[in-house]
C-alpha cells in the first residue's frame, strides 16, 4: 500500500531529558523518523524538552517545541498546529505514557487526532501486565506465573501462594523503576510498596522468580499487510535477574539451536499479531530454562526501544526510519534496503559477524551506593563492538568501555575476586581474572549461571594469553602468527602487558611484520549483495573491503559511551562537525563506539568506523585513510586524551593543538598563563603529592576546592573544609584516578555567582557566543546547576570584563575552534576558575539560545575558515531568555541524599524558553519533570528563606516551617540537606536543595501563577 495521503501534519513526541533507561537512542530514532517523514512530504511537528539533541535543531522539523512533555502543553500544541496524527513510538516510555494520557483526557478525540505506529489498544495490551498476560494465554504462549495487584493487602496474600524469591514489576514505568527481586519478606514489603507508588496506575505484577534462566530478545517489525520480519536475535550474557539494559548482550544469539530459535521466532510472530502492533517495531523478551528448555515470554515493548537502536547498529537495518514509514501506510516490500539498494526491507537481515554490547555505569558518582544489579536499570551508557568471532567482539567491546581492564583485578586475592561474582558491573573482569588463575568453567557456572559456552570462550582467551608467552620472542613473529593472535581481539597494549613491552614497541613490531587490520562492511546480507553504505569495522583477515578514496578527508573522533559528565551533548557537536565539513567539500570519517547515537547512524558521515576509541584502533584508521585532518576537540575528554599520542605518531590534528590543550588542562601551566595575562584567580597551588597537598592547604587556609588535572564532570572534585576532610579526599583520589595526578587546591569562593562562557576563536579573532549565569552558587558543579542565557543579575560592567578577558585568553592560548571558560563573580570581581579548549556540554543549549551552530563553526575553523568568513563578528543578542535545567538520577540510587555538590551527577537536561526569565525557568523545571505546584503547601527548612516564604505566600501557597506529622507538602525547599529530601523525592514531591534555587523557584511560581496557562511558541518562531 502506498503512503497515506489523508495525513498532512504529523506530531512526533520526543523522550525529554536523558535519563537512566531512556537515553540518546531516542534522539537517534527520532532524528531518523523526522528525516524519513519530511522526505515523504509530510509536515512534521516535534515536541521535546531536551536541547542536547540533534532532533530539536530547528532545521529538522517544520515546527520544534522545546516545551514540557505534559498533556497540558502538548494539548496546546495540538490546538495550535492541528496535526492529523501523533507518532508516539519513537520517544520511549515517556512518549507512550503521554499518548495514553492524551487519549484518556479526551484530547485526541476533541481535536480529531489519531495515533499511528501503535494504537491505544496495542499500547494497553503491550504495557498493561494483566492485559498482556491474558493475551498470551489466548495464543498459548506461556508467561511467568504471576498476578497483578493493586494494594499491599492483595500483594501479601499472593506472596503467600507463590513464595520467595519473587519478582515485582510496576506497570507503565521506565527502565524497571520501582521494581526488583525480593529474597526476603522484608524486601518484598519494601519493594512492593515502592512499586505501587511509582506505577502511574498503582499496580504491580508479582511473578515467580526465574533467576538464572537464559534471556533472549527478538527485534520484530510488522506492516499492515501482516508481513512480519525478525531483524535480529539478541542474547544476554548475564542470566535472568539483571535488567537487559545492564547486561552484556550479544547479537546474533550464540547459544540457541536452530530449533529453539525457530520456536522463539514463531512465538514472536504470534505475539506481535495478537498485541496488534500493525505498523512498526517491537522488542520481545524471552526467558529459557537451561535445565529443561521451558520458554516463557517476559514482556514486549510496542515501540522503538534501546534494543532497537542496538539492533539497527548491529545489522545496518534502520528500524526507526522503517517504523516511521510503516506508520504512514507503507508495506515492508515497498521500501528499499538503503544498504544493498536491490533488496526490499521485507528481507530479514543476515549477518556474518558478532556484535557485543557492554553497559557503562556511574556508581563512582554515588559513593556508598550498593553496586548490585537487578531488575531496575542503573547503567548510564553503553558501547558496542563488531568482530568476526565472539572473542574478538568481546575484547574490542571491553577496551571500548575505557575502563581499567586488568589493573586492579590483577592485584586482588582469590577471595576478593570471588566476592565479585554476584551480578555487578565488575563481574566479567572478576570472572576473567579467576579463569586466568585456573578456575574451572563449571565452578564459575555454578556461581554465576552465565552460560557455559560464554565461560568457555573466556577461558579460551585466557589460554591464548598463556600461549602468547610460548610463541617465542615477539620480534620473530611472522605475519600469520600476528594475525592469529590479533583475530582473538588482543590489543597491542594487552600483548605488551603479557610480554613485557610498551604498546608502541608492540605496534612497531606488528607493523614490521606487515600485520595490519583489514576493514569489513556491515551490509545486512552477509556479503550476498554489494553494499552501498560505508559502515565498517576492523578485523585481522585477508580481504580488505574498504578502499580509501582520493578526496580530501577529515576524521572526527566521537565521545564513546555516554556517562555522567560526557553525554549526548558531545555527540551533537561531532554530528554538526560532520555536516559542516561535508558542506565545505570534505569527505567525513566518523570513529565511535556508541550504538545509541546519531553519529553512528550509517548515513550521518561519509564513512563510519564502528571501532574502540583507543590509540591503536584510531591510528590504524588514520594510516588506512590518510586524512588531511583529525578533529579531537568535539568529543569530550575521550578523544582529547588521545590527542598527544596521535600527534606524536603522525596524525594531522587540526583545530586546537595538543600543546594548547595541555596548557589549559594542566593546572600549573594554566595558572602561570592567567598570571601573565593579569586574570584574577582564586588563590591556589598545585600539589604533586599528598604530603605537599597538606602543606599547601595549611598555607592557603580552608575551605578549599580540590580537584585533579584532566577530569571531566567534576570527577573526584570536592569542597574540603578541614585537614581531616582533605586527608580522606586524597586517599580516595589516589585510589580512584589513574596515575599520580597533580592536585589543584583553590581557595573556595563561598556564595560566588558562577558563569559559563562559550567562545569561538580562529587564532586571529575571538568572539564570545554566549554567557550563562548559573542559578546555584559556586560549589555546585556547572553541569548540575540550572543556568540562564542571557544573564539576569549581573551588571553590564562585569559582563563586559568577562567577555573581553575570555576573548583575550582564547587568543593567547591559540585556540582554533571552541573554548569554554568558567568564572566566579564575588564582590564585583570575576575570578577565572578553568578554561577548556574544546566543545563543552553547553554547546547545544547555547547554539539554540543564540541561534548560531557553534560546533559547525568550530569545525569550519579547524578546516581553515575564519570567523569573518563564517559571519560571526560579535556576540549574538538573543531574542528570548533560555534556561537549562538538569535531570538527576537520584531515584535509581536508593541510598543517596539528593543534594548537589562539585561532582557532577546529572544525566540529562531540559530547556525552557520565554520572554520572561522566571517563566523560562518554570518551563525548564516542568521539562525536567520537576513539577512545581501553583497551589497547596510549601515546607521550608533552613535559614535565610524568609524572602522565599514571602514570595510563595504572595503567590497564594500556604508556607509552613515544620513538617505536619508524616504528611508531605506539595513543595519541599530544604537547604539543610536533611533525609526528608529523600523521602519527598521518592513520593514524587518536587524538591529544592539550594538557597539560590529556592529564590528562583519562588519567583517562577509567582510569575507562573500570575500568567495563568502559558502559551506555546516553536523554536523557529523564537529565532526567526
Swiss-Prot record:
As to how many cofactors bind and how, the note says:
Binds 4 Mg(2+) or Mn(2+) ions per subunit.
Question: Which Gene Ontology BP terms does the record give?
Answer: 'de novo' UMP biosynthetic process; glutamine metabolic process; L-arginine biosynthetic process
Q: Write down any Gene Ontology CC term.
A: cytoplasm
Chain segments carrying region Oligomerization domain: 403-546
Pathway it works in? Amino-acid biosynthesis; L-arginine biosynthesis; carbamoyl phosphate from bicarbonate: step 1/1; Pyrimidine metabolism; UMP biosynthesis via de novo pathway; (S)-dihydroorotate from bicarbonate: step 1/3
Q: Identify the Gene3D superfamilies for this entry.
A: 3.40.50.20, ATP-grasp fold, B domain, Carbamoyl-phosphate synthetase, large subunit oligomerisation domain
Matching entries from InterPro entries are given as:
ATP-grasp, CarbamoylP_synth_lsu, CarbamoylP_synth_lsu_oligo, CarbamoylP_synth_lsu_oligo_sf, CbamoylP_synth_lsu-like_ATP-bd, CbamoylP_synth_lsu_CPSase_dom, MGS-like_dom, PreATP-grasp_dom_sf
Record GO terms (molecular function)? ATP binding; carbamoyl-phosphate synthase (ammonia) activity; carbamoyl-phosphate synthase (glutamine-hydrolyzing) activity; metal ion binding
Query: Briefly, what is this protein's role?
Result: Large subunit of the glutamine-dependent carbamoyl phosphate synthetase (CPSase). CPSase catalyzes the formation of carbamoyl phosphate from the ammonia moiety of glutamine, carbonate, and phosphate donated by ATP, constituting the first step of 2 biosynthetic pathways, one leading to arginine and/or urea and the other to pyrimidine nucleotides.
Q: Which family does it belong to?
A: Belongs to the CarB family.
HAMAP family from the UniProt entry: CPSase_L_chain_B
Its protein name is Carbamoyl phosphate synthase large chain
